């Protein structure tokens, strides 16, 4: 119609209305898709979908609330996954307390999906294991002074046993006239028994 009558207000109005209907249809489909992604606990995808919708129309309350909701769940889920991916970091008091706070926040989520419930169960399990003391046997030559960094001075001994929490550890040994030694090891509930041999044997 505009090609025939370029100045026709009726034709222009019709074209504008058609474009508006197309945009509304697109936004409706995006909202439906974002809601489905929330149901599937696909928080990153849902948040991005709501972001795209708001780029088209930033006044849509439904999209604003959806983006806020998805972003909140996205951040919580990501934070929990970071803890679950590196459980030995729970040996740090700060990390442990942060994980407990995440757990409390996770428990407050209403209508949690199966993925969220699994995250809670796994986080509870890791927090419990982080407090489990595991037996570690240290063996030396009765001449090397052994130190467990950030833990204690073990001194000289043939064998010594300690109860340690899961985590990453470093043991060092020193002996006059010999090269110092350093051993890094990790203690986890999924491994063991733990036996660490440390002694200075290389003369200087």
Where are the predicted features?
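Residue signature of alpha-solenoid helical repeat architecture, marking inter-repeat boundaries
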Residues: 24-25, 77
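Short loop/turn and low-complexity linker motifs enriched in small/turn-promoting residues
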Residues: 4-5, 13, 17, 39-55, ...
